[in-house]
Design a protein with these regions (language model features):
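C-terminal "cap" of GNAT-fold acetyltransferases
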Residues: 115-141
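Conserved active-site alpha-helix within GNAT-family acetyltransferase domains
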Residues: 96-123
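A short helix-loop-beta-strand connector motif used in the catalytic cores of GNAT acetyltransferases and
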Residues: 29-40, 44, 61, 130-133
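A short, internal acetyl-CoA/4′-phosphopantetheine-binding micro-motif in the GNAT/acyltransferase core
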Residues: 65-72, 98
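A short beta-loop-alpha structural element at the N-terminal edge
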Residues: 5-18
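Conserved acetyl-CoA-binding loop-helix of GNAT-fold acetyltransferases
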Residues: 73-86
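Conserved beta-strand in the GNAT
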Residues: 40, 46-55, 59-66
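Helix-loop element at the rim of GNAT/NAT acetyltransferase active sites that forms part
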Residues: 10, 21-32
Length: 141
């Protein structure tokens, strides 16, 4: 259950270091991190989660979504992904190795996707995941 004292807000430049440290700790996509692409979930002024929306000319990509261990399974990740989708102005994709989480939020696995996402797919496959473990999913609105 989402904590009552949770707030979701756009990240500030001052949040950049914490986001980067947590993203690295969680082995998430840390390529070209820009603080202004993120939202953060805060509880008692502490960042407990974060999510990123990368905007490309042809689509948007939900990426680098993480929640600290003690706050997982409380719906915070889902809440952040829904907020990122809400703010997107184009088709939304995600490249992931946890498709069940994103299926619950309305994403479906696709075989065709914008070429701009191929680099991310290749990165995931090079990072100890095989073809059957890396999924590109599209938000079905």
């Amino acid at each position: 259950m989402v904590p009552n004292d949770l707030i979701l807000i756009p990240a500030l430049e001052a949040d950049a270091l914490i986001i980067e440290q947590l993203a690295k700790k969680f082995d998430l996509d840390c390529e070209d991190l820009k603080w202004n692409q993120f939202i953060v979930a805060k509880k008692n002024d502490n960042i407990i989660g974060f999510g990123r929306l990368r905007k490309y000319p042809e689509c948007a990509e939900v990426a680098t979504v993480g929640v600290i261990a003690e706050e997982r399974k409380n719906g915070i990740g889902s809440l952040m992904v829904k907020e990122l989708i809400r703010t997107a102005s184009s088709e939304v994709f995600v490249t992931c190795v946890i498709p069940d989480f994103f299926k619950k939020l309305g994403f479906q696995i696709v075989k065709q996707y914008p070429p701009v996402l191929q680099k991310k797919v290749d990165f995931c496959k090079a990072y100890d995941f095989n073809d059957e473990q890396v999924f590109v999913m599209k938000m079905q609105k």
